[in-house]
Amino acid sequence: MENELFMNAGVSHPPVMTSPSSSSAMLKWVSMETQPVDPSLSRNLFWEKSTEQSIFDSALSSLVSSPTPSNSNFSVGGVGGENVIMRELIGKLGNIGDIYGITASNGNSCYATPMSSPPPGSMMETKTTTPMAELSGDPGFAERAARFSCFGSRSFNSRTNSPFPINNEPPITTNEKMPRVSSSPVFKPLASHVPAGESSGELSRKRKTKSKQNSPSAVSSSKEIEEKEDSDPKRCKKSEENGDKTKSIDPYKDYIHVRARRGQATDSHSLAERVRREKISERMKLLQDLVPGCNKVTGKALMLDEIINYVQSLQRQVEFLSMKLSSVNTRLDFNMDALLSKDIFPSSNNLMHHQQVLQLDSSAETLLGDHHNKNLQLNPDISSNNVINPLETSETRSFISHLPTLAHFTDSISQYSTFSEDDLHSIIHMGFAQNRLQELNQGSSNQVPSHMKAEL
């Protein structure tokens, strides 16, 4: 049964021996062994036995040596995996060898030694009942069996008359590709972990992204974006010059300046740089309006030079005007305290000066009293109104007019609050004493003796 299953993979034939288990098949073969063999057919039977045995042994060795696929989708008796099927098959074959006198030992196993065939009687029975197609000893059969074995494919499930309870699945279409199983166990975990579809998809994506980056369409699109960004401020300038109040571009928002990587620039960085340059240009326009003749200059460097020259000229003009004001207003440097201390009363002789003024006042009063009494005695008819000469009165008036008035002193006092009252009284007494001395000198020029003049 196993021979037919392997040799006719994917082709359903009516089984020769329909037995529920392997033990019944063994009993039937043992019963056949006791029957006599026809000697006329012995040569042909043994030749067929040798050919079938060599083909079956090569197929079985390739089946055992080929690795089983890791992802098995069928289950045997509720237990998933192909190991169960292989164990049952090897056990059955071993039992067959034990029955015919070939035991599996260390040096003689069922894999290395040729397996014994059933007796000639059984071969005759199978020959007569079901004619099997003879297979030639093709050396590439083992490789094909290892690659496309009935256990690794889904054709094994298509057999409905098999004794194993296997879930039936739809057959494989011709358009689908068979998964190639790795021949060595070292590469099997790598093939199981890395699916072929994902790796090929990732490689294709990488190639597509590289081709898109290097394509001329991407380069042209980036250039168009840069040209649009450069043309935006130019449009704003043209609209401002023409006086159009409508804004062609929305006002930019305030962006945070982010430090970009080396050799790269982010969108926020470029926008923030553009906003900063626009603010600088606005301030330059304000300066351009303030500085006369700066509108004729083109370029920021020349504009800055003109502004610097204009500021320096303004500074020179301010210095010249300050010097002119200081030369015109001389009273600003006039120090009243220094003049009073030097000319009117020195600080060292201040007390002596007060004493001399008081002595002059007392002596003048005594002299005036004596002179008045003598005039009354000599000229009793002259009234008291004509005592003073009218010339003397005119001279005294002119002299008083030249003297500083009290208003002048009050102005100086208001300007200098630190001026003391004692100094003010001394100045007033000094003025009155001088007036009296002049009157005495003019009135008694003819009458006062010479010794009085010497004392004065």
From Swiss-Prot:
This is Transcription factor bHLH62. Residues 159-254 are annotated as: Disordered. It is found in: Nucleus. The gene is BHLH62. Keywords: DNA-binding, Nucleus, Transcription, Transcription regulation. The keyword Iron does not apply. Residues 223-254 have a biased composition (Basic and acidic residues). GO terms for biological process: regulation of DNA-templated transcription. GO terms for cellular component: nucleus. Residues 264-314 form the bHLH domain. Residues 159-185 have a biased composition (Polar residues). The keyword Nucleus applies. GO terms for molecular function: DNA-binding transcription factor activity; protein dimerization activity; transcription cis-regulatory region binding. Expressed constitutively in roots, leaves, stems, and flowers. Homodimer. The lineage of its organism: Eukaryota, Viridiplantae, Streptophyta, Embryophyta, Tracheophyta.
